[in-house]
């Protein structure tokens, strides 16, 4: 069986690696080709070393509570290369009226779970705190249809909870506008909490007590006895993950700087993949591990409905600005993992990670590495500036918010145009329609962050599922 994977990001690498595993497990030889338009693998993952600093241009970690990336690391034999967060500083700040306020202890993304930290918090007004408490009394929603995250938080917890916490935290994950973001597609557990417990605060409180009793310390048990922090990364940065996956693929199976221009089927039912240099490759199956809008472009002549559905998934652009400083140049104690910036603050940045505090080995002694996030669905206009302008803007914001009083030792700007899928209300229905259309094209599969999860672990799951489904499809065709 010949398999072509288009796209060398995490989803494509996971798909290719899983195909190699399944080939070995089932004794079915596979001729694997992975095509990537760029001159490197990894997609948005890119790690750089500079002057003793370890710079993550893209994702700096993955969630351990989603098991797929950890499970893959275990199969790869690199679990001992994983690094936990430094939990001495496990807290987040929120910018309010130009100052950094700690997120109250026990606040779980959308709602509080502890009474006293909320009461004493300087982040919320008293009317805002009382409005959040009304969640304990409000009835559950009767309409079971999809709802935006913004509408859900306003309804259950009030506008202040949305503007001060939910919106900036969600922006840090999805770079999205919460008034368009589908709750069912992004945070379905909160929908389930309302259905089963009525009150989100009560449901979170019960869950936190259960977790504290069974695990403790804010760590995740992966089922093998190991306990991980919520976020984990690699000793040498996330690109180590990419290198390990690439090294496990068959020699000569990866084609870099190879742009695919079209995917179609021939009269015999084989798949044809055309490249910009005029090559035509044939395969029994194809996995498109690209952005949805790229997949739509490649399939334009195959199926009129499928590209239309794929282009209905919007994307947002973003950028990261990494800045290195001497420790004495920053007045703030940096006693947390970073801060988020609510949109109501009207600032040109959406968040900042204290990279060298969050993980060890990211900066030389007596130095600090900070990473500022810009753009997203609510503030894409800021990205119109050049790299120098973005770096200067990020530095000015750190001067105001952290008391920085010296120029950075260096800056590194990384841009990600149309790279973050936006899970708007109705997203799951769109994905189901896409999957329905794929059923008309045996041997064609999609993978990546556009469909059922945007994180690294989600992309691993998506790629591995595509490979498994392709093997099942091929076996079914052989037996029919």
Where would I find each of the regions flagged by the language model?
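Conserved Rossmann-like nucleotide-cofactor binding loop
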Residues: 11, 40, 293
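Beta1/beta-strand and adjacent pyrophosphate-binding region of the FAD-binding site
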Residues: 1-11
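Conserved hydrophobic helix-helix packing surfaces used for dimerization/oligomerization
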Residues: 3-5, 32, 444
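Active-site/ligand-binding neighborhood in enzyme catalytic cores
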Residues: 88-91, 111, 115, 128-262
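Mid-domain catalytic core of redox enzymes
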Residues: 256-370, 375-384, 388, 396, ...
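Conserved flavin/dinucleotide-binding core of flavoenzymes
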Residues: 44, 104-106, 333-336, 350-480
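Glycine-rich FAD pyrophosphate-binding loop
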Residues: 20-50
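Dinucleotide-binding Rossmann-like beta1-alpha1 core, especially the glycine-rich loop
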Residues: 51-140
């Amino acid at each position: 069986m010949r398999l072509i994977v288009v796209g060398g990001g995490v989803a494509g690498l996971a798909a290719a690696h899983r195909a190699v595993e399944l080939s070995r497990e089932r004794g079915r030889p596979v001729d694997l080709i992975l095509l990537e338009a760029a001159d490197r693998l990894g997609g948005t993952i890119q790690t750089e070393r500079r002057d003793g600093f370890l710079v993550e241009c893209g994702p700096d970690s993955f969630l351990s509570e989603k098991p797929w990336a950890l499970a893959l690391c275990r199969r790869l034999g690199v679990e001992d290369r994983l690094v936990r967060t430094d939990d001495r500083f496990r807290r987040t700040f929120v910018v309010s009226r130009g100052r950094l306020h700690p997120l109250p202890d026990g606040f779980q993304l959308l709602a509080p779970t502890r009474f006293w930290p909320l009461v004493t918090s300087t982040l919320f007004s008293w009317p805002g705190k009382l409005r959040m408490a009304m969640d304990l009394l409000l009835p559950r929603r009767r309409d079971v249809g999809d709802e935006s995250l913004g509408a859900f938080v306003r309804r259950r917890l009030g506008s202040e909870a949305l503007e001060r916490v939910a919106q900036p935290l969600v922006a840090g994950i999805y770079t999205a506008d919460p008034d368009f973001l589908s709750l069912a597609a992004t945070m379905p557990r909160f929908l389930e909490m309302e259905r089963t417990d009525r009150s989100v605060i009560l449901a979170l409180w019960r869950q936190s007590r259960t977790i504290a009793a069974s695990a403790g310390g804010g760590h995740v048990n992966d089922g093998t006895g190991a306990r991980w922090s919520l976020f984990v990364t690699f000793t040498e940065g996330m690109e180590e993950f990419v290198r390990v996956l690439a090294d496990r693929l068959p020699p000569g199976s990866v084609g870099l700087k190879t742009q695919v221009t079209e995917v179609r089927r021939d009269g015999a039912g084989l798949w044809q993949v055309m490249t910009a240099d005029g090559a035509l490759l044939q395969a029994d199956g194809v996995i498109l591990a690209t952005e949805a809008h790229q997949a739509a472009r490649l399939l334009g002549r195959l199926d009129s409905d499928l590209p239309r559905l794929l282009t209905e998934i919007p994307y947002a652009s973003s950028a990261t600005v990494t800045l290195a400083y001497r420790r004495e140049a920053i007045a703030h104690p940096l006693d947390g993992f970073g801060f988020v910036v609510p949109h109501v603050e009207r600032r040109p940045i959406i968040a900042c990670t204290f990279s060298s505090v969050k993980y060890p080995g990211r900066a030389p002694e007596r130095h600090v590495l900070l990473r500022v996030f810009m753009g997203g669905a609510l503030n894409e206009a800021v990205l119109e500036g050049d790299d120098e302008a973005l770096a200067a803007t990020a530095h000015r914001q750190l001067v105001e918010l952290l008391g920085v009083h010296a120029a950075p030792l260096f800056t590194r700007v990384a841009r990600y145009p149309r790279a973050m899928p936006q899970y708007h209300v109705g997203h799951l229905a769109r994905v189901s329609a896409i999957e329905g259309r794929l059923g008309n094209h045996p041997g064609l599969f999609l993978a990546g962050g556009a469909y059922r999860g945007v994180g690294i672990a989600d992309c691993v799951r998506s790629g591995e599922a595509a490979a498994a489904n392709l093997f099942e499809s091929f076996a079914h065709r052989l037996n029919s």
